[in-house]
Amino acid sequence: VEHLTEDEKSQFRAAFDIFVADAKDGTISSKELGKVMKMLGQNPTEKDLQEMIEEVDIDGSGTIDFEEFCLMMYRQMQAQEEAKIPEREEKELSEAFRLFDLDGDGIGDELKAALDGTGENVETWEVDEMMADGDKNHDSQIDYEEWVTMMKFVQ
């Protein structure tokens, strides 16, 4: 909870209060969590709901109090941030591919020229091997999908 801003805590308090409006004890049970998940288009099983609660149930009560709710929301925010990282990587891969693919037909000769231009002593057979490994449809070019697949193994 200490990682949250006052504004985030305030927003989470408002959401928490909606969650517990029907609850007699002021905490979120699997029943309340299930209702909200269904409103969000999810259809978790009772087991799924219990596991979600257990992940943040610090005091072992079987329900989620406000502090535990904040922990759950903070973890959700972190997961969303981490999900953005592949988007940035995808954008970088796309930009790199565009830089290599000068004539718009995929990269083949361009890859060889780019590797030669690095100043590294890259042997022709090494470039040929990279092309053979990356060129899944055997058209002597690396298209964008093949490029992305190839780069995943590089990282």
Swiss-Prot record:
<dbReference type="GO" id="GO:0005509">
    <property type="term" value="F:calcium ion binding"/>
</dbReference>
<dbReference type="InterPro" id="IPR050230">
    <property type="entry name" value="CALM/Myosin/TropC-like"/>
</dbReference>
<dbReference type="InterPro" id="IPR002048">
    <property type="entry name" value="EF_hand_dom"/>
</dbReference>
<feature type="domain" description="EF-hand 2">
    <location>
        <begin position="44"/>
        <end position="79"/>
    </location>
</feature>
<keyword id="KW-0677">Repeat</keyword>
<feature type="domain" description="EF-hand 3">
    <location>
        <begin position="88"/>
        <end position="121"/>
    </location>
</feature>
<feature type="binding site">
    <location>
        <position position="139"/>
    </location>
    <ligand>
        <name>Ca(2+) 2</name>
    </ligand>
</feature>
<comment type="function">
    <text>Troponin is the central regulatory protein of muscle contraction. Tn consists of three components: Tn-I which is the inhibitor of actomyosin ATPase, Tn-T which contains the binding site for tropomyosin and Tn-C. The binding of calcium to Tn-C abolishes the inhibitory action of Tn on actin filaments.</text>
</comment>
<keyword id="KW-0514">Muscle protein</keyword>
<feature type="binding site">
    <location>
        <position position="63"/>
    </location>
    <ligand>
        <name>Ca(2+) 1</name>
    </ligand>
</feature>
<feature type="domain" description="EF-hand 4">
    <location>
        <begin position="122"/>
        <end position="155"/>
    </location>
</feature>
<dbReference type="Pfam" id="PF13833">
    <property type="entry name" value="EF-hand_8"/>
</dbReference>
<dbReference type="Pfam" id="PF13499">
    <property type="entry name" value="EF-hand_7"/>
</dbReference>
<protein>
    <recommendedName>
        <fullName>Troponin C, body wall muscle</fullName>
    </recommendedName>
</protein>
<feature type="binding site">
    <location>
        <position position="137"/>
    </location>
    <ligand>
        <name>Ca(2+) 2</name>
    </ligand>
</feature>
<keyword id="KW-0479">Metal-binding</keyword>
<feature type="binding site">
    <location>
        <position position="61"/>
    </location>
    <ligand>
        <name>Ca(2+) 1</name>
    </ligand>
</feature>
<feature type="binding site">
    <location>
        <position position="59"/>
    </location>
    <ligand>
        <name>Ca(2+) 1</name>
    </ligand>
</feature>
<keyword id="KW-0007">Acetylation</keyword>
<feature type="domain" description="EF-hand 1">
    <location>
        <begin position="7"/>
        <end position="43"/>
    </location>
</feature>
<feature type="binding site">
    <location>
        <position position="146"/>
    </location>
    <ligand>
        <name>Ca(2+) 2</name>
    </ligand>
</feature>
<feature type="binding site">
    <location>
        <position position="141"/>
    </location>
    <ligand>
        <name>Ca(2+) 2</name>
    </ligand>
</feature>
<comment type="similarity">
    <text>Belongs to the troponin C family.</text>
</comment>
<dbReference type="InterPro" id="IPR011992">
    <property type="entry name" value="EF-hand-dom_pair"/>
</dbReference>
<feature type="modified residue" description="N-acetylvaline">
    <location>
        <position position="1"/>
    </location>
</feature>
<dbReference type="GO" id="GO:0016460">
    <property type="term" value="C:myosin II complex"/>
</dbReference>
<feature type="binding site">
    <location>
        <position position="135"/>
    </location>
    <ligand>
        <name>Ca(2+) 2</name>
    </ligand>
</feature>
<feature type="binding site">
    <location>
        <position position="57"/>
    </location>
    <ligand>
        <name>Ca(2+) 1</name>
    </ligand>
</feature>
<dbReference type="InterPro" id="IPR018247">
    <property type="entry name" value="EF_Hand_1_Ca_BS"/>
</dbReference>
<feature type="binding site">
    <location>
        <position position="68"/>
    </location>
    <ligand>
        <name>Ca(2+) 1</name>
    </ligand>
</feature>
<keyword id="KW-0106">Calcium</keyword>
